């Protein structure tokens, strides 16, 4: 199985399966002498960790990360050496027996059939590499990526659950840490609690839309045509389990706008442009034009489908091609979009780190 690595200069390779001994990643291309502690990585992992509320899978994984290489102690603290940084997270709460009854059946909505079609076999124990368990390693890599681009802040929020959207006039980043949904709208978070409780108790699931905003991104990251910043962001976000759509800025909403409404007008800044660039009067472009960052906040949204593992019986076929029914046991998220928030942040941080290093390598410090 190839294609377990993403990035060009900042490269991340992930490994491990949902019910294997461990999962982990190797981060290559991290500059030397960056302050890095295991506590900083753990802080991001704890935001994604399962079992923290009744609205996520009850699989109890501590997700304690170990740094195996690429850092050393100095007089000023622990820093990166420039060597590959290997990170390991042990799996401690696998229950493979939950999947023994369906090992020969293809779960609708999962990658069971496609893995079997491609490789001739699949890991039925929690989905193996196709499990969202793999995304913990991306969050760990993202914690390192956050340190590379000076002055950049990457934050995510759940802005829609099922058909229910937040009120953007009530957006408050401080609210995200106060509810289990990463929701910036206090009133909508209260609604989501009762709404998802009903879905959870029925054994069903629901989808969500996540928005990631990167502020402080310098102008000039990305390149035309085949190395567009938004192209790489879209690919990175689409690589997350259960993601079925990505948009940048106004996204598909731009199709409803006129040219006058969509184009982000500009005015001269007090610094007479220079490296700070002009002042934009709107941000329908999501901080990217021609594949290159404008200096505005980079805004991306992605849609997460409902968890395919639900308690109601479903029609399917087995490995012999016979029609059958399937009943999925195990522990699953009623809305996998909740824990996708820190994963989306991590992927955006990794892409920005990669493009920052590529930009610096091509044009030098500016």
Swiss-Prot record:
GO terms for biological process: amino acid biosynthetic process; aromatic amino acid family biosynthetic process; chorismate biosynthetic process. Belongs to the chorismate synthase family. NADP(+) binds at residues 48, 54. The keyword Lyase applies. It comes from Nitrobacter hamburgensis (strain DSM 10229 / NCIMB 13809 / X14). Its EC number is 4.2.3.5. It catalyses: 5-O-(1-carboxyvinyl)-3-phosphoshikimate = chorismate + phosphate. It is an enzyme of class 4 (lyase). It holds the Pfam family Chorismate_synt. Homotetramer. FMN binds at residues 129-131, 241-242, 290, 305-309, 331. This reaction introduces a second double bond into the aromatic ring system. Pathway: Metabolic intermediate biosynthesis; chorismate biosynthesis; chorismate from D-erythrose 4-phosphate and phosphoenolpyruvate: step 7/7. PANTHER family: CHORISMATE SYNTHASE. Its cofactor is FMNH2. The gene is aroC. CDD domains: Chorismate_synthase. Keywords: Amino-acid biosynthesis, Aromatic amino acid biosynthesis, FAD, Flavoprotein, FMN, Lyase, NADP. GO terms for molecular function: chorismate synthase activity; FMN binding. NCBIfam families: aroC, PRK05382.1. This is Chorismate synthase.
């Amino acid at each position: 199985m190839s294609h377990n690595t993403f990035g060009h200069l900042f490269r991340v390779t992930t490994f491990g399966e949902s019910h294997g001994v461990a999962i982990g990643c190797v981060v290559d291309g991290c500059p030397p002498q960056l302050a890095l502690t295991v506590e900083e990585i753990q802080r991001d992992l704890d935001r994604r960790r399962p079992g923290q509320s009744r609205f996520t899978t009850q699989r109890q994984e501590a997700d304690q990360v170990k740094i195996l290489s690429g850092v050393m102690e100095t007089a000023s603290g622990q820093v990166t050496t420039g060597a590959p940084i290997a990170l390991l997270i042990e799996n401690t709460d696998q229950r493979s027996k939950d999947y023994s009854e369906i090992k020969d059946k293809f779960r609708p909505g999962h990658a069971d059939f496609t893995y079997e079609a491609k490789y001739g076999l699949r890991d039925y124990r929690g989905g193996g590499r196709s499990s969202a368990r793999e995304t913990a390693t991306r969050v760990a890599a993202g914690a390192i990526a956050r340190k590379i681009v000076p002055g950049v802040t990457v934050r995510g929020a759940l802005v829609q659950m099922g058909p229910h959207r937040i009120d953007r006039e009530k957006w408050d980043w401080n609210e995200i840490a106060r509810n289990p949904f990463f929701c910036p709208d206090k009133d909508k978070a209260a609604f989501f609690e009762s709404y998802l409780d009903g879905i959870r108790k029925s054994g069903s699931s629901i989808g969500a839309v996540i928005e990631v905003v990167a502020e402080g991104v310098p102008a000039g990251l990305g390149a035309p045509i085949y190395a567009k910043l938004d192209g790489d962001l879209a690919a990175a976000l689409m690589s997350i389990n259960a993601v079925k759509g990505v948009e940048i800025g106004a996204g598909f909403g731009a199709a409803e706008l006129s040219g006058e409404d969509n184009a982000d007008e500009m005015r001269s800044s007090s610094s007479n442009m220079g490296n700070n660039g002009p002042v934009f009067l709107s941000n329908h472009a999501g901080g990217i034009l021609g594949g290159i960052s404008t200096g505005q906040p980079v805004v991306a949204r992605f849609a997460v489908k409902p968890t395919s593992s639900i308690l109601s019986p479903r029609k399917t076929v087995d490995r012999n091609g016979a029609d059958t029914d399937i009943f999925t046991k195990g522990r699953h998220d009623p809305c996998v979009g909740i824990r996708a928030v820190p994963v989306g942040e991590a992927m955006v941080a990794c892409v920005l780190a990669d493009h920052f290093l590529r930009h610096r390598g091509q044009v030098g410090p500016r």
